[in-house]
Amino acid sequence: MALSACNTETDSAGRELTVHGTAAFPIACYHDDLEAAPVPWHWHEELELLIASEGGVLAAAAGEKYTLAEGDGLFINAGVLHADWPLAVGRCRLHSVVFHPRLVGGSPDSVFCQKYLQPL
């Protein structure tokens, strides 16, 4: 699985249009240069784990703002509106792993998915 640049395009409701991975392997890894282009407000049906790989990141999700120092991470649940910006002027890079909930929870009807993933 390659690390790709993420170009976030959304529909009028803010839903990201990018397909993350494939039906057989629904996971993708991205790198974003926030100095060049912040990640705009968007949401998707996948889970996302992001890590500030260089510089500080201001991340917003579910109505909260989070300051991430280099090496810090944040988990974003499916369907949550979120965005990312550089914390200060200068180099700012973000790595993210975006994956479908069925990779960890199985079916949306499973006890694991309903009890542990959906409440997050």
Please provide the spans of the model-predicted regions.
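Short amphipathic alpha-helical leader/targeting segments
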Residues: A69-E70, W85
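A hydrophobic/aromatic-rich effector-binding and dimerization subdomain
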Residues: A2-S12, E16-F25, L81-L120
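Short hydrophobic-aromatic micro-motifs
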Residues: L74-I76, G105
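Generic protein-terminus/edge-of-domain signal
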Residues: M1-T67, G73, V80
